[in-house]
Amino acid sequence: MGELNKSARQIVEAVGGAENIAAATHCVTRLRFALIDESKVDQEMLDQIDVVKGSFSTNGQFQVVIGQGTVNKVYAELVKETGIGESTKDEVKKASEKNMNPLQRAVKTLADIFIPILPAIVTAGLLMGINNILTAEGIFFSTKSIVQVYPQWADLANMINLIAGTAFTFLPALIGWSAVKRFGGNPLLGIVLGVMLVHPDLLNAWGYGAAEQSGEIPVWNLFGLEVQKVGYQGQVLPILLASYMLAKIEVFLTKRTPEGIQLLVVAPITLLLTGFASFIIIGPITFAIGNVLTSGLISVFGSFAALGGLLYGGFYSALVITGMHHTFLAVDLQLIGSKLGGTFLWPMLALSNIAQGSAALAMMFIVKDEKQKGLSLTSGISAYLGITEPAIFGVNLRYRFPFIIAMVSSGLAGMYISSQGVLASSVGVGGVPGIFSIMSQYWGAFAIGMAIVLIVPFAGTYAYARFKHK
């Protein structure tokens, strides 16, 4: 524990001293600081500390990569050393917002909404992958699936499919819970709002197109005003805007309603007003906007698939550095909920992560420092499993050329899989296990993309380092 105390003291000194720390907390792998002045950080000193695997600044926070299992111990020593008191993640986020511009605040808001629901979505993606293995034809048998050859497996596959599909079927409820909580309202009302938007009495959003063509869209007649009885399954924008409205109405009413009757007044009025607004105004408008955006994106990638894959696949790692990659989860979910039924963006995310891992692994055979060798190995494996921060910030950005070579490689792989029309039926673990989220008919093309990002970044990084050394 003496070494950890020493490391904590060194970290405090490197980030500008205790007086420069407005708040501090930690996540699974990183210390998160809200610093008063980031220009006071001594980067060179920080990089020399044994427990530090990397550092970066994003969304108004200065984050120091320590590693799972060690970070909580270092944080405990840091609290003792500085006397700042333990801060919650929310407190650090609030303190860090002072350092953000409007765009960063918007990106952070989306990240705060979608990151908490990621475990449910990723789990659903993995289970859908298992269902794909059981039901897809031509994987283990030339023209049949496992359930066709072994019918006794059919009900098991059906149960897995039901469990996997639940998160996407009730996606507005998940988003409603997280969004209302983020906007300062009661998250339970957010769940009710989300479930309301996918109520079984409503026309399923996926059947809207056919119903519109046949002229059979059911409506409510509110004193002459016809309101379509349409659900918003798989939609992101309606629940986001409705959640914001719900939270603001609830906060407004709570401040102005006597405490004794809040239970009878606040929630009923809040849900009624938000519900009417959702079905009459918010839902139809955002549904149309969402369709225009997804149709436009699909059209662009349909016409310029290779170019789109090259750019998105190549620059995704750069988005990770800025923190803007979180915004694309909403786009992925919107694409999955569209007529396309899948996302062409998420497969490139998985390949980008693998590329950064391959470049980091190559550095293990290049660097002389034993600490960096160990970090290159562990961070490379971590990136293969979908966690790229140690590889990007601890290894690749430190030497620059591995990061650039990985970007070029993932751009090439993205160009290839986009030209092949590869789609993921869900989002999952963004690394090697990501293949299970890919629609089975595209496994071959995705495997070639994986081969590119496994081989090219490793070989390119190794060759460049040797050539540069000579």
Curated annotation (Swiss-Prot):
It comes from the Bacteria. The active site is at 27 (phosphocysteine intermediate). Residues 108-470 form the PTS EIIC type-1 domain. It is found in: Cell membrane. Pfam families: PTS_EIIB, PTS_EIIC. Induction: Induced by trehalose-6-phosphate. Repressed by TreR. InterPro entries: Glu_permease_IIB, PTrfase_EIIB_Cys, PTS_EIIC, PTS_EIIC_1, PTS_IIB_1, PTS_IIBC_treh, PTS_maltose/Glc_sub_IIC, PTS_Sugar-Specific_Components. GO terms for cellular component: plasma membrane. One of its GO terms (biological process) is phosphoenolpyruvate-dependent sugar phosphotransferase system. It catalyses: alpha,alpha-trehalose(out) + N(pros)-phospho-L-histidyl-[protein] = alpha,alpha-trehalose 6-phosphate(in) + L-histidyl-[protein]. It is a multi-pass membrane protein. Keywords: Cell membrane, Kinase, Membrane, Phosphoprotein, Phosphotransferase system, Sugar transport, Transferase, Transmembrane, Transmembrane helix, Transport. Its EC number is 2.7.1.201. The modification Phosphocysteine is found at residue 27. Residues 1-88 form the PTS EIIB type-1 domain. The phosphoenolpyruvate-dependent sugar phosphotransferase system (sugar PTS), a major carbohydrate active transport system, catalyzes the phosphorylation of incoming sugar substrates concomitantly with their translocation across the cell membrane. This system is involved in trehalose transport. The PTS EIIB type-1 domain is phosphorylated by phospho-EIIA-Glc (EIII-Glc) on a cysteinyl residue. Then, it transfers the phosphoryl group to the sugar substrate concomitantly with the sugar uptake processed by the PTS EIIC type-1 domain. The EIIC domain type-1 forms the PTS system translocation channel and contains the specific substrate-binding site. B.subtilis does not possess a trehalose-specific phosphotransferase enzyme IIA component, however it seems that it use the glucose-specific phosphotransferase enzyme IIA component to delivers trehalose-6-phosphate into the cell. This is PTS system trehalose-specific EIIBC component.
